[in-house]
Amino acid sequence: FPSPSSPSTQPELIEKRFQPKSAPATEKSSRTIEAQKNEPGIWERGEVKVPSTQPPTDPSSSLSGFQMSVQSGLRAYHTSNVLRQSKENEERSGVFEANFMASVLTPDIEVGDYYVLLPRLDMMLQWAQYQEKSSLLDYRFGLIKGGVGLAMPNDWNLGFGLDYNILHNISSGDKTFDSWSPSFSLQKGYAVFKNSYLMFDATARISNVAQTQVFEAAGIFADSGDNVQNSISLTLFHPFDETGKLVIVPRIGLSRTNYYKFPYKHRLDYLFSGGANLTYRWMEYYDLQGFMSFSSMSSNDIEDFEAFDIGLALSGNYRF
């Protein structure tokens, strides 16, 4: 389910990126590493993200240094626990999702000899329909996020962002919640094995939520209250050949969410998530993806739950 936390961005596998080099301390950081980490992809539940495998646009072809990209995707999957409730109350469901994303990257801003500021703007719309509990769960979600990254030597990156997101129930048309969320992230990339790339990501964010509906099944929009969230994740990008047509992306993550306002004050949630995506670039601008994810949440206030999702996705992307 969408939440006040915006989708975290993950690195993109790009041409000749299968043998990534850490920038020596005597060299300037570049947009290349930041682009690897921030290209939009399909936002998946369980915080597993499908990266775009579109080769980067030649900077010389961009208008005055600006780079723009659009992406759209369809996903169909099965979930073992549609209401995110305790095991005895689990209910299975099929889910269909559609989304559209657009991103604008501004020209690099050099800061001294070794640092580069990387401003960007991201927008996303997502729709979901559920086989079960559709009147309660079908949603329309919108997100706009502005941010700036600081690319540093040796594949270190800092990120600062502010996003606004809003969720509506499709059946009733009513707003479920909206929120403002500032965030800070730290990322580090590593070249591993022969062609693979491993990324460590740590993120802290504060969500200020205006919730207009409260559901009896608390696991449905579990983090739709004012909260502070800290998360860490490891993501591995491994291509099966030098062209990158077939890529597997396993990921594990852990988040801690602390609620600080009524009616959720003093609530503390821990969410473990893991999963993998297998992406095949079958045409120049189109990807086919198979994915699965597992999530397990423990809380001192609401019911603990586990959920397993598996499905297929089709995405298309284009860069200007």
Language model: regions and residue ranges:
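Surface-exposed strand-loop-strand hairpins of Gram-negative outer-membrane beta-barrel proteins
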Residues: 75-100, 132-134
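Outer-membrane beta-barrel "beta-signal"
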Residues: 291, 306-320
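Repeated loop/turn-to-beta-strand initiation elements of outer-membrane beta-barrel proteins
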Residues: 108-120, 153-160, 190-200, 241-248, ...
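Transmembrane beta-strands of outer-membrane beta-barrel pores
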Residues: 74-82, 104-106, 123-131, 162-170, ...
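Membrane-embedded beta-strand positions of outer-membrane beta-barrel proteins
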Residues: 70-72, 119-123, 146, 158-162, ...
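Transmembrane beta-strand segments of Gram-negative outer membrane beta-barrel proteins
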Residues: 60-80, 118-121
